[in-house]
C-alpha cells in the first residue's frame, strides 16, 4: 500500500468528510451476483485519455465485479473511431454464453456495414475489424460523440439513419452475391431550392421522392445528405442522448448517462480576469493584447470548435496551442503561458486554482454528459450494474470522485471507486 493512498485514506476519515458521510448514511441494497456472469468471459471497458473517463471506468468496473464479472480496463486514447470499432469487432465468444440478454446478435453483414460506416478520426488510417481488440463498453462524452456521428453537426439524424440503412442493404446484398443498381443522380427541384434550410431533416428526405428510392435505399440516403444540419447548441443532454441512440450503428446501444451537470467551459485566471476586466466571452473582442489559448485537438476545427468564438462573439483567437491533456492546459494557464483554456465544468482544477469561468450567453460551448456505449449483446445484469452507477453520478459525486483521484496527492482509482459505491450522495 503506497504512502499516498494512506494519506488520502486518512483524509477520507477526517472531519472534513463528516457531512458527506452523514448524507450517505442510507445505502442502496447490494446488487445480487449473477451466477452466469463468469461464463461471459472477460468484460473489457474502454475509456479515453480524459481523467474523468478513467475515474468513471473504474467505478463501472467495481460495480460489474460486484455482480460477478471479470473486468479489464483498456485506455483507448483520443481515437473515438477506434474505440467504437472495437465495440463492433468480433468478440470470439460463443453466441450463447449462459448470460441473459434480451437483444440478439447482429448478422455479419450488419456488423460489417456498421463498422465501415463509422467515420475515421482525422489523420488516422483505416483499420480492419480483425485487427481491433474487442471491447464491451466504451465511455464517451455525449456532445463530442454526437458531433462525430453527424460530421460536425452537418448531418441530421434522419440523414445518418438513411445512410446507415443504405450501407446495411448494400452489405447484405453483397453477402448474398447481389449487385444493386447505382443510385440515380438527384437533381434539385424548384421546391427543393425554394425550401432552402427551412425544412427539417426528415422532411427534406421525403420532399422529392423518386420512383427508384424504394427499390434502391442509397437514393434516399443520397438525397438526405442535403438535410438541415442539427443545432447542438439548442439541444439538452436528453436531446443529445436521444439523437445518439437513434443513429448509433447496428450492434451498439447507449446506456443511461451520468446525471452530472457538465459542459465545456473556457476559463482564465483571476489575475487575467482583473487585468482585462474579462468575465464573459463577449468581452474577448475588447481585449487589445493577444490572448494565448490552450485547447484540445478536437476543439481546433469545425463550427463547434474555436471558430465559434468568431461566429458568435466576433473574436478570432490568434495564439492557439493544442494540448489534449487537461492537466497540461491548466499548468499552461496558471504559469501564464496562455491566458484562456478549455476545461469541463466538473474539473476540480477550476476550484483548486480559483479559475474564472467565462460566461457564455450565446452558448458557444456544448452541454456534455458522460455516457456508456455498449456492445449490443452485453448481458442484462451488466447493463443494470452500469445504469445503477450512472444514476448515482450526479454533479456532486462526479466532482468528488475527481477530487479524490486527481491533484498532487490522489488516491488509487479502485479505492475511490469503492468509496463512491459504498457512500453515494443522496
Language-model region placement:
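An extracytoplasmic/periplasmic, membrane-proximal ligand-sensing/linker region
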Residues: 41, 51-52, 187, 211, ...
Amino acid at each position: 500500500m503506497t504512502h499516498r493512498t494512506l494519506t488520502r485514506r486518512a483524509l477520507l476519515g477526517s472531519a472534513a468528510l463528516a457531512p458527506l458521510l452523514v448524507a450517505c448514511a442510507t445505502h442502496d441494497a447490494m446488487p445480487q451476483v449473477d451466477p452466469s456472469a463468469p461464463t461471459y468471459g472477460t468484460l473489457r471497458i474502454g475509456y479515453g485519455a480524459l481523467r474523468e473517463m478513467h475515474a468513471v471506468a473504474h467505478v463501472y468496473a467495481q460495480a460489474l465485479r460486484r455482480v460477478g464479472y471479470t473486468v479489464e480496463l483498456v485506455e483507448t486514447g483520443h481515437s473515438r473511431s477506434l474505440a467504437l470499432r472495437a465495440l463492433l469487432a468480433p468478440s470470439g465468444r460463443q453466441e450463447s454464453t449462459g448470460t441473459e440478454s434480451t437483444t440478439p446478435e447482429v448478422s455479419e453483414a450488419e456488423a460489417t456495414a456498421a463498422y465501415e460506416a463509422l467515420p475515421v478520426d482525422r489523420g488516422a488510417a483505416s483499420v480492419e475489424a480483425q485487427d481491433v481488440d474487442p471491447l464491451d463498453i466504451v465511455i464517451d462524452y455525449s456532445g463530442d460523440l454526437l458531433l462525430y456521428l453527424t460530421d460536425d453537426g452537418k448531418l441530421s439524424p434522419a440523414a445518418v439513419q438513411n445512410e446507415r440503412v443504405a450501407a446495411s442493404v448494400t452489405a447484405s446484398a453483397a453477402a448474398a452475391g447481389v449487385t444493386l443498381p447505382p443510385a440515380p443522380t438527384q437533381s434539385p427541384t424548384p421546391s427543393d431550392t425554394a425550401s432552402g434550410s427551412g425544412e427539417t431533416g426528415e422532411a427534406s428526405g421525403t420532399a422529392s421522392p423518386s420512383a427508384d428510392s424504394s427499390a434502391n435505399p442509397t437514393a434516399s440516403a443520397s438525397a438526405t445528405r442535403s438535410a438541415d444540419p442539427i443545432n447542438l447548441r439548442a439541444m439538452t443532454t436528453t436531446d443529445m442522448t436521444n439523437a445518439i441512440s437513434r443513429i448509433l450503428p447496428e450492434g451498439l446501444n447507449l446506456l443511461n448517462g451520468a446525471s452530472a451537470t457538465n459542459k465545456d467551459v473556457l476559463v482564465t485566471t483571476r489575475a487575467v480576469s482583473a487585468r482585462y476586466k474579462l468575465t464573459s466571452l463577449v468581452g474577448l473582442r475588447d481585449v487589445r493584447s493577444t490572448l494565448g489559448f490552450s485547447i484540445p485537438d478536437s476543439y481546433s476545427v469545425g463550427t463547434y470548435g474555436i471558430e465559434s468564438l468568431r461566429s458568435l462573439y466576433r473574436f478570432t483567437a490568434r495564439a492557439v496551442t493544442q494540448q489534449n491533456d487537461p492537466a497540461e492546459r491548466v499548468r499552461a494557464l496558471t504559469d501564464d503561458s496562455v491566458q484562456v483554456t478549455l476545461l469541463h465544468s466538473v474539473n476540480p482544477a477550476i476550484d483548486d486554482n480559483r479559475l474564472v469561468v467565462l460566461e457564455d450567453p450565446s452558448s458557444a460551448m456544448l452541454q456534455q454528459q458522460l455516457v456508456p456505449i455498449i456492445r449490443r449483446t452485453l448481458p442484462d445484469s451488466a447493463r443494470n450494474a452500469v445504469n445503477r452507477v450512472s444514476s448515482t453520478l450526479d454533479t456532486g459525486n462526479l466532482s468528488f470522485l475527481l477530487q479524490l483521484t486527481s491533484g498532487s496527492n490522489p488516491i488509487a482509482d479502485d479505492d475511490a471507486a469503492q468509496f463512491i459505491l459504498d457512500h453515494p450522495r443522496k
